[in-house]
Swiss-Prot record:
The keyword Ion transport applies. Produces ATP from ADP in the presence of a proton gradient across the membrane. The catalytic sites are hosted primarily by the beta subunits. It comes from Cuscuta exaltata. The lineage of its organism: Eukaryota, Viridiplantae, Streptophyta, Embryophyta, Tracheophyta. Keywords: ATP synthesis, ATP-binding, CF(1), Hydrogen ion transport, Ion transport, Membrane, Nucleotide-binding, Plastid, Translocase, Transport. Its main location: plastid. It is a peripheral membrane protein. GO terms for molecular function: ATP binding; ATP hydrolysis activity; proton-transporting ATP synthase activity, rotational mechanism. It holds the Pfam family ATP-synt_VA_C. This is ATP synthase subunit beta, plastid.
Length: 490
């Protein structure tokens, strides 16, 4: 069994045999440590700072640079308050190791794999290092299949690939985290799958809200914790940059075990992948590297690739990853979101304009893309319906300037009909969420793909032209829209 640097007890005697060094410099979350000649630790090895006298070991660091003169530079995963030059440092001989397997379900961990939910210790008989190689090329599974989410706009216009990588793009406050919570809820209930959630550099309040929501919805089973469907790994925005940079790898390591050993299909949620890049940028500056474009780290592509290439499907199982991507100043050309784009199979772009109109989920139907939207994968009917919906919405977008200047009455009869149908489609793309019931007062709806296609075909065919557009707002399937229209008339 590998030694977990975050566990103590009987392992102290084993630790006594490890290499030892001393802190020679502390610059915020970065430590320089001197080791005896010939006893240098490897890059990525975990170092543990041992407190003075009878204090327990308290701060875990990760080796980032070998400086020469028997010195290494390491980044701390915890606060460095109270550390002093001359303190003893122990080289653990391996990278940071975290618990994996069924014992992680229903629990909340930090970057070091320590439980932080006050439910006692976790079984550490099965552990794994957070730094691992991506699966070999011959192990990869390349078959294409749709992953149904129950969210109309996603399933119809930018469907997700089972075992693929999906990005949720949006600025601050347009609904990325709510959409992720809804996906976790739908997937746990409809597919019964295991999920791992990596909270990377986001608000502590959101992490707490997510945990409470999961307990209420039964995704986390407090009475029988082993029946829970999700493991949570948090590295919040108040934590040191080292923790925020590595917490994504901790979550991924737990997901890899379910895929490779348990041979399961796993969902990995990362909220927010931009914070992973941001933390890497901070660490890069602290290590003295020359900044690249817009102040980002010169190793941006390498760091992103080392994380993303491990998220894949193998012949044993799959990891489907859904990643929220904060877009700084709503600029999709910023190096952080632009680098993320290269790794994704589908993009779900959230629009501030739609959010301002009150259309939730505020998914932009024209900007969102998916490599799965091909007739040979989704079928002719799905593909044709999606294309017609996009064409109608695109024509409406082109006509908006004319409407703003001249008014709706100046349009041709055909264009007026297109605008009316587009407005119905736009509203029908909205949907009440299970996780937003407390805010909206409307019960959440899960809409199957076949039902979604049927609904949009009815709108496009003109059969529902007589119904008022408000009947299509925040409903599930098309039958609910027709019922709502009847209620509006009475």
């Amino acid at each position: 069994m590998r030694i977990n640097p975050t566990t103590y007890g009987s392992e102290i005697s084993l630790i006594e045999k490890k290499n030892r060094g001393r802190i020679v410099q502390i610059i915020g979350p970065v430590l320089d440590v001197a080791f005896p000649p010939g006893k240098m630790p490897n890059i990525y090895n975990a170092l543990v700072v041992k407190g003075r006298d009878t204090e327990q070991m308290n701060v875990t660091c990760e080796v980032q640079q070998l400086l020469g003169n028997n010195r290494v530079r390491a980044v701390a995963m915890n606060d460095t308050d109270g550390l002093m030059r001359g303190m003893e440092v122990i080289d653990m001989g391996t990278p940071i190791t975290v618990p994996v397997g069924g014992s992680t379900l229903g629990r909340i961990f930090n970057v070091l794999g320590e439980p932080v939910d006050n439910f006692g210790p976790v079984d550490t008989n099965t552990t794994s290092t957070i730094h691992r190689s991506a699966p070999a090329f011959i192990q990869l599974d390349t078959k294409l299949s749709i992953f149904e989410t129950g969210i109309k706009v996603v399933d119809l216009l930018a469907p997700y690939r089972r075992g693929g990588k999906i990005g949720l793009f949006g600025g601050a406050g347009v609904g990325k985290t709510v959409l992720i919570m809804e996906l976790i809820n739908n997937i746990a209930k409809a597919h019964g799958g295991v999920s791992v959630f990596g909270g990377v550099g986001e608000r502590t309040r959101e992490g707490n809200d997510l945990y409470m929501e999961m307990k209420e919805s039964g995704v986390i089973n407090e009475k029988n914790i082993t029946e829970s469907k999700v493991a949570l790994v948090y590295g919040q925005m108040n934590e040191p940059p080292g923790a925020r940079m590595r917490v994504g790898l901790t979550a991924l390591t737990m997901a890899e075990y379910f895929r490779d050993v348990n041979e399961q299909d796993v969902l990995l949620f990362i909220d927010n992948i931009f914070r992973f890049v941001q933390a890497g940028s901070e660490v890069s500056a602290l290590l003295g590297r020359m900044p690249s474009a817009v102040g980002y780290q010169p190793t941006l592509s390498t760091e992103m690739g080392s994380l993303q290439e491990r998220i894949t499907s193998t012949k044993e199982g799959s990891i489907t990853s859904i990643q929220a991507v904060y877009v700084p100043a709503d600029d999709l050309t910023d190096p952080a979101p632009a680098t993320t784009f290269a790794h994704l199979d589908a993009t779900t772009v959230l629009s501030r304009g739609l959010a301002a109109k009150g259309i939730y989920p505020a998914v932009d139907p024209l900007d969102s893309t998916s490599m799965m939207l091909q007739p040979r994968i989704v079928g002719e009917e799905h593909y044709e319906t999606a294309q017609k919906v996009k064409q109608t919405l695109q024509r409406y977008k082109e006509l908006q300037d004319i409407i703003a200047i001249l008014g709706l009455d100046e349009l041709s009869e055909e264009d007026r009909l297109t605008v009316a149908r587009a407005r119905k489609i736009e509203r029908f793309l909205s949907q009440p969420f299970f996780v937003a019931e407390v805010f909206t007062g409307s019960p959440g709806k899960y809409v199957g793909l076949a039902e979604t296609i049927r609904g949009f075909n009815l709108i496009l065919s003109g059969e529902l032209d007589s119904l008022p557009e408000q009947a299509f707002y925040l409903v599930g399937n098309i039958d609910e829209a027709t019922k709502k229209a009847m209620d509006l008339k009475t």
